[in-house]
From Swiss-Prot:
<dbReference type="GO" id="GO:0016528">
    <property type="term" value="C:sarcoplasm"/>
</dbReference>
<dbReference type="GO" id="GO:0055091">
    <property type="term" value="P:phospholipid homeostasis"/>
</dbReference>
<dbReference type="GO" id="GO:0140214">
    <property type="term" value="P:positive regulation of long-chain fatty acid import into cell"/>
</dbReference>
<keyword id="KW-0446">Lipid-binding</keyword>
<dbReference type="GO" id="GO:0071073">
    <property type="term" value="P:positive regulation of phospholipid biosynthetic process"/>
</dbReference>
<protein>
    <recommendedName>
        <fullName>Fatty acid-binding protein, heart</fullName>
    </recommendedName>
</protein>
<dbReference type="GO" id="GO:0042632">
    <property type="term" value="P:cholesterol homeostasis"/>
</dbReference>
<dbReference type="GO" id="GO:0005324">
    <property type="term" value="F:long-chain fatty acid transmembrane transporter activity"/>
</dbReference>
<feature type="binding site">
    <location>
        <begin position="127"/>
        <end position="129"/>
    </location>
    <ligand>
        <name>(9Z)-octadecenoate</name>
    </ligand>
</feature>
<dbReference type="GO" id="GO:0015909">
    <property type="term" value="P:long-chain fatty acid transport"/>
</dbReference>
<dbReference type="GO" id="GO:0050873">
    <property type="term" value="P:brown fat cell differentiation"/>
</dbReference>
<feature type="binding site">
    <location>
        <begin position="127"/>
        <end position="129"/>
    </location>
    <ligand>
        <name>hexadecanoate</name>
    </ligand>
</feature>
<feature type="modified residue" description="Phosphothreonine">
    <location>
        <position position="8"/>
    </location>
</feature>
<dbReference type="GO" id="GO:0006631">
    <property type="term" value="P:fatty acid metabolic process"/>
</dbReference>
<dbReference type="GO" id="GO:0005829">
    <property type="term" value="C:cytosol"/>
</dbReference>
<dbReference type="Pfam" id="PF00061">
    <property type="entry name" value="Lipocalin"/>
</dbReference>
<dbReference type="GO" id="GO:0070542">
    <property type="term" value="P:response to fatty acid"/>
</dbReference>
Length: 133
């Protein structure tokens, strides 16, 4: 099922992303730059290993993981987190934990688009990506 997420995805819409970053403690200047970028996400699968690369003029990140196995991650805003990604009901659920906090990044496919829902406490941001040819 994770195969359905494989591809190159370009951000086309973003809702409430600044509030989400603010809730994580991201500084004003970084939020301003990050809010203006339109990142490309590349999802690859090689055997049991999934790679998610996020590329933008702001910062490039890459994570490699296997479903259900916790791993260390350094986020785009330089948080050092413990991450766990699972597949549940056709959704990739990515949970990051650090310093007693937790945020969830849920990726799902809706009408051929990749919908990324970011949740931290009561703050929710939705980012919509379209697949590139």
């Amino acid at each position: 099922m994770a195969d359905a997420f494989v591809g190159t995805w370009k951000l086309v819409d973003s809702k409430n992303f600044d509030d989400y970053m603010k809730s994580l403690g991201v500084g004003f200047a970084t939020r301003q730059v990050a809010s203006m970028t339109k990142p490309t996400t590349i999802i690859e699968k090689n055997g049991d290993t999934i790679t998610i690369k996020t590329q933008s003029t702001f910062k490039n990140t890459e994570i490699n993981f296997q479903l259900g196995i916790e791993f260390d991650e350094v986020t785009a805003d330089d948080r050092k987190v413990k991450s766990l990604v699972t597949l549940d009901g056709g959704k990739l659920i990515h949970v990051q934990k650090w310093n007693g906090q937790e945020t969830t990044l849920t990726r799902e496919l809706v009408d051929g688009k990749l919908i990324l829902t970011l949740t931290h406490g009561s703050v929710v941001s939705t980012r919509t990506y379209e697949k590139e040819a």
